[in-house]
Amino acid sequence: MFKFNDEKGNLKCSFCGKPQEQVRKLVAGPGVYICDECIELCSEIVVEELGVEEEIEFQDIPKPKEILTILDEYVIGQERAKKALAVAVYNHYKRINTNSKIDDVELAKSNIVLIGPTGSGKTLLAQTLARILNVPFAIADATSLTEAGYVGEDVENILLKLIQSADYDIERAEKGIIYIDEIDKVARKSENPSITRDVSGEGVQQALLKILEGTVASVPPQGGRKHPHQEFLQIDTTNILFIVGGAFDGIESIIKRRQGEKIIGFGSDPNIVDVDEGSIMSKLIPEDLLKFGLIPEFIGRLPVLASLEQLNEAALVQILTEPKNALAKQYQKMLELDGVELEFDEGALAEIAKEAIERKTGARGLRSIIESTMLDVMYELPSREDVKKCIITAKTITDKEKPKLLLEDGTELDEGSDTKTSA
């Protein structure tokens, strides 16, 4: 029986070594003693461990509307895609909580395909979902994968990235999210099955089938190729949510051809109908992915299709300023640490957006444009304690003029010198 320190004697804690006189309570066990401080420490460790278990159980899955509201804080536009993702993610983790089987009805996985041009927000959507749910997240590039036996990465290395993201906690990793980018680059070259080996196309799709559906995979703990004498990590992929994304360049013409099969007329192509480019992707169906070069079994394991639109100038300006982690806010915070207020006028934001559209890089290209614009400023300002404000104008972007630098009294620093001029 445990007892408190009501006995006198030269007793001390078996864990921290403190004598009885230096602690408030000393609990005795068969041949051992533990003090109140060590009990408190052990209690904290247990609570912390139980907290992780509760996190894994997903008892409070956010509802689709709540997921969409949080996505809106980070991702501009793409309303249809965000709604599809919110529903798919909610259903996926609800399925995990019910062990995927209710009254003999087995709930299938809701793996997702994101289709949209470069810089439209595919990767950001996947990252934000993982952040909302507080689950491990990993990104893989499909172009680096090859089927087993060929030079390149095995598909199991994707799972290793997720395990590493979960700090090698396999149970946590088994409820994570994996985003595979550039999936369109592993499409086979034609609709018909190839009689020759396609190691980085159809072969990769075949290799991905099992982990998409759910299997216990053997993963080399250090990555690389498998060899017979190494130990493997075992991970069950049944409850891992897979999101695959790609630009799928040219799929619009496949959709148009299907839409226009019965359209005939003098001087017109009977296979193509004139459809608004903005709405064409909303008519995407799985058969279009089959025509593009994904194999039927692969498409069957990706039941949720979500298409993203090309971002226009207005959307790119919003991306620069509105999200919680907007680029403009990031650079303003960066200069604020040097005691300088940064301002982008409306003309500057519009020109940054136009340049990103011209480069065909979408939102992904915004950072590089701002970075090149701000390089000289970020180099000079840490050494200029007299400068209190920096203004980026449209001409700073288009004509490469230097930004306006204002001193504490509101006067402008003369370009190329320390001379003050009227602001």
UniProtKB/Swiss-Prot annotation:
Family to which this protein belongs: Belongs to the ClpX chaperone family.
UniProt region (Disordered), positions on chain: 404-423
Gene name for this UniProt entry: clpX
Species in which this protein is naturally found: Lysinibacillus sphaericus (strain C3-41)
Keywords noted in UniProt: ATP-binding, Chaperone, Metal-binding, Nucleotide-binding, Zinc
Protein name: ATP-dependent Clp protease ATP-binding subunit ClpX
Listed CDD domains: RecA-like_ClpX
Sites where the protein binds ATP: 117-124
Any GO CC annotation of this UniProt entry: HslUV protease complex
Role according to the record: ATP-dependent specificity component of the Clp protease. It directs the protease to specific substrates. Can perform chaperone functions in the absence of ClpP.
